[in-house]
């Protein structure tokens, strides 16, 4: 499949978010894969959870993964414009919509959540702006927003401006 992100948990477990193209699909069918796969620290497959769709534990592009200090798995479900939160066995705990259409997510040791939105516009997410949202992984509160850098110089993909696809710390 098309892995989007890999996260290694504190115990060494490996989580993989799959599939990138599902964010562009509206219905189940060929290529409509949306799941998280879990592997042991030595790479042995343990389980998969999630499927393509719009409901809890369903994904349209699990694009980025992060883990908070409690060991909760945060999945940036970009095609559904939300974060879904799970325990490490795949039990759905919560869904947050206030961080927009996330391309990358990072949670620091103090549970500060950084979510980069590189795609919101009138086509992909009307009413939202590209940029970095910073908030609490404990409560879901968004504290601040840093808008995208707008440039008059063309970028490598032919557009204008600059916006991150992930979060590097």
What does each model-identified segment do?
Residues 1-169:
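Eukaryotic scaffold repeat domains enriched in small/polar residues
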């Amino acid at each position: 499949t098309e892995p989007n992100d890999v996260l290694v948990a504190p115990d060494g477990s490996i989580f993989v978010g799959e599939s990138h193209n599902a964010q562009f699909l509206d219905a189940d069918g060929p290529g409509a894969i949306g799941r998280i796969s879990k592997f042991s620290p030595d790479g042995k497959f343990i389980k998969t959870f999630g499927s393509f769709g719009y409901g809890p534990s369903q994904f349209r592009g699990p694009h980025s993964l992060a883990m908070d200090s409690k060991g909760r798995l945060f999945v940036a479900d970009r095609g559904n414009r939300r974060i879904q939160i799970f325990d490490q066995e795949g039990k759905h705990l919560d869904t947050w919509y206030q961080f927009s259409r996330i391309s990358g997510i990072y949670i620091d040791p103090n549970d500060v959540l950084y979510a980069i939105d590189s795609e919101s516009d009138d086509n992909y997410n009307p009413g939202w702006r590209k940029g970095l949202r910073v908030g609490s992984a404990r409560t879901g509160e968004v504290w601040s927003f840093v808008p995208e850098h707008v440039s008059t110089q063309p970028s490598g993909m032919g557009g204008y401006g600059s916006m991150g696809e992930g979060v590097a710390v």
